């Protein structure tokens, strides 16, 4: 469960290292975001000499949360960290590599480019 002011790791090589959620895209007063939700975030830490800079406002999709994800078949998945992938306005990832495992639910939400770049889909 990601809410405003939550810090997230970045799971791609776009140049950002850490994000802070400032808004959840969707309804006007939604409190929590889960895997597959798009957020507006600010970059808190970035790699030197990268196209993305600190304090830049970007869009990202959540790929891992430490809160449990319950599937319809009864399986529960929990990750060690909260992580997101930086995306552009069309929903394509800005990076060319994805680090770590991501959830299968992203494929159902039409983030197929992110799923194809991921090394492991759970």
Curated annotation (Swiss-Prot):
<dbReference type="GO" id="GO:0003735">
    <property type="term" value="F:structural constituent of ribosome"/>
</dbReference>
<keyword id="KW-0694">RNA-binding</keyword>
<comment type="similarity">
    <text>Belongs to the universal ribosomal protein uL14 family.</text>
</comment>
<dbReference type="InterPro" id="IPR019972">
    <property type="entry name" value="Ribosomal_uL14_CS"/>
</dbReference>
<dbReference type="InterPro" id="IPR005745">
    <property type="entry name" value="Ribosomal_uL14_bac-type"/>
</dbReference>
<dbReference type="InterPro" id="IPR000218">
    <property type="entry name" value="Ribosomal_uL14"/>
</dbReference>
<keyword id="KW-0689">Ribosomal protein</keyword>
<dbReference type="GO" id="GO:0070180">
    <property type="term" value="F:large ribosomal subunit rRNA binding"/>
</dbReference>
<keyword id="KW-0699">rRNA-binding</keyword>
<dbReference type="GO" id="GO:0009507">
    <property type="term" value="C:chloroplast"/>
</dbReference>
<comment type="function">
    <text>Binds to 23S rRNA.</text>
</comment>
<dbReference type="GO" id="GO:0006412">
    <property type="term" value="P:translation"/>
</dbReference>
<comment type="subunit">
    <text>Part of the 50S ribosomal subunit.</text>
</comment>
<keyword id="KW-0150">Chloroplast</keyword>
<keyword id="KW-0687">Ribonucleoprotein</keyword>
<keyword id="KW-0934">Plastid</keyword>
<protein>
    <recommendedName>
        <fullName>Large ribosomal subunit protein uL14c</fullName>
    </recommendedName>
</protein>
<dbReference type="InterPro" id="IPR036853">
    <property type="entry name" value="Ribosomal_uL14_sf"/>
</dbReference>
<dbReference type="Pfam" id="PF00238">
    <property type="entry name" value="Ribosomal_L14"/>
</dbReference>
<dbReference type="GO" id="GO:0022625">
    <property type="term" value="C:cytosolic large ribosomal subunit"/>
</dbReference>
